[in-house]
Regions:
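Positively charged n-region of N-terminal signal peptides that target proteins for export
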Residues: 1-6
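Residues within mature, well-folded domains
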Residues: 20-166
Length: 166
């Protein structure tokens, strides 16, 4: 009888672990995080609250200046399809350069050139990506930007299985 009870508990524990492991999904998407998403995430992470009106206004002024300075120095961006995403949406997309990403999102939480680590982060998408990816930048909460020698070639995001879809 005691063995049967132990087997039942072991089966339940394994089932719970299997369910918990499958709650997150890595999805490959063409658009990365917006600058405002990172700002809000960092505010919650550091202050455990939403940014105040003054903090938002100050951040928007700083971001306007950074984007304006970058666009003055890189006028060729205006003729690309990424221009609207960069200037108005302030969002990184496939094709964005490292400098554009740093302008919008600041420095990454982690950078790697290790193929094994990148394969772990990309999961099921790695076989398609591995030929062109040279480096990965990680941004919270679950964004990974994959670069070739020049720009972003792929973007993945780890989301909960039950997160809302936008």
């Amino acid at each position: 009888m005691a063995i049967a009870i132990r087997l039942v508990w072991a089966t339940l524990a394994l089932g719970a672990l299997a369910c918990a492991a499958s709650l997150q999904v890595v999805e490959k998407i063409p658009q990365g995080p917006r600058a405002v998403e990172m700002f809000y995430y960092r505010s919650y992470a550091y202050n455990n609250r939403e940014p105040s009106f003054d903090e938002r206004r100050k951040w928007e002024d700083v971001m306007d200046e950074r984007v304006g300075t970058y666009l003055r120095e890189h006028q060729d961006l205006e003729s690309t399809t990424r221009y609207t995403d960069f200037r108005f949406w302030r969002q990184v997309v496939v094709g964005s350069t490292r400098e554009e990403v740093r302008t919008l999102l600041d420095d990454p939480a982690e950078q790697t050139t290790d193929p094994a680590l990148m394969a772990t982060m990309a999961q099921q998408h790695w076989p398609v990506m591995q030929a062109r990816v040279k480096e990965a930048w990680v941004y919270p909460p679950g964004w990974v930007l994959y670069f070739d020698d020049n720009a972003i070639v792929d973007i993945t995001r780890k989301v909960g299985k039950y997160d809302p879809v936008y």
